Design a protein with these regions (language model features):
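Detector for Asparagine
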Residues: 4, 19-21, 31, 52, ...
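Short amphipathic beta-strand/extended segments with alternating polar/hydrophobic composition
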Residues: 44-49, 69-80, 122-141, 145-146
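Acidic, proline/glycine-rich low-complexity IDRs
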Residues: 132-166
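Generic intrinsically disordered, low-complexity segments enriched for polar/acidic and small residues
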Residues: 6, 40-42, 74, 100, ...
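Surface-exposed beta-strand edges and flanking loops
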Residues: 20, 26-28, 37-38, 49-51, ...
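Context-gated lysine
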Residues: 8, 15, 28-30, 54, ...
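Charge-rich, low-complexity N-terminal segments
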Residues: 1-56
Length: 166
């Protein structure tokens, strides 16, 4: 698997859409954007946007050499979660206070890759980090969420979003 430093390196790489004309259609329950980094072409990335009762944005990496997939970052709205209780030496200090924490479905949170654990096993409340979209209260909030998530994963392409018609 990856080290914490490798995961950070991958998140920090500048990424662009493989298909720059792709549109996120919010009337669909799931959208997938395929990304690539011209800084390191050994990897492909994708972003999955799930909008149903639970709203989830996830970015994963595809290592072309080993043909393996690893989740790097995910944001959950309206989904519960339980962080591991065990603290390994690879756990960053900022996550230690959240060991064994149960997230209620009403507590939005960001999952992070941590070396030595299953991918995305650790999460931190959005209220405790500098991510601007803390809650989703109306469909119009989704566009801002997608743009801020793109910024978080260093996606440089413009994203075309088609709003759902209610």
């Amino acid at each position: 698997m990856l080290t914490n430093q490798e995961a950070k390196y991958l998140l920090d790489l500048e990424k662009v859409l493989i298909n720059p004309n792709q549109t996120v259609d919010l009337s669909k329950k799931k959208n997938r954007l395929e990304l690539i980094s011209h800084q390191d072409s050994d990897y492909e990335f994708w972003v999955e946007i799930t909008t149903n009762q639970k709203i989830i944005l996830k970015t994963s990496i595809h290592n072309l050499e080993s043909n393996s997939y690893v989740g790097l970052l995910r944001i959950d709205y309206r989904g519960g979660h339980h962080n591991p209780a065990n603290i390994l030496p690879t756990l960053p200090n900022f996550l230690k206070p959240y060991a064994d924490k149960w997230f209620k479905p009403t507590e939005s949170h960001m999952h992070l890759y941590v070396e030595g654990y299953k991918p995305l096993a650790w999460a931190i409340p959005l209220t405790d980090i500098n991510f601007p979209v803390k809650e989703i209260t109306q469909p119009a909030d989704l566009s801002g969420l997608i743009f801020n998530f793109a910024r978080e994963i260093n996606l440089k392409s413009l994203i075309n979003i088609q709003q759902a018609i209610l």
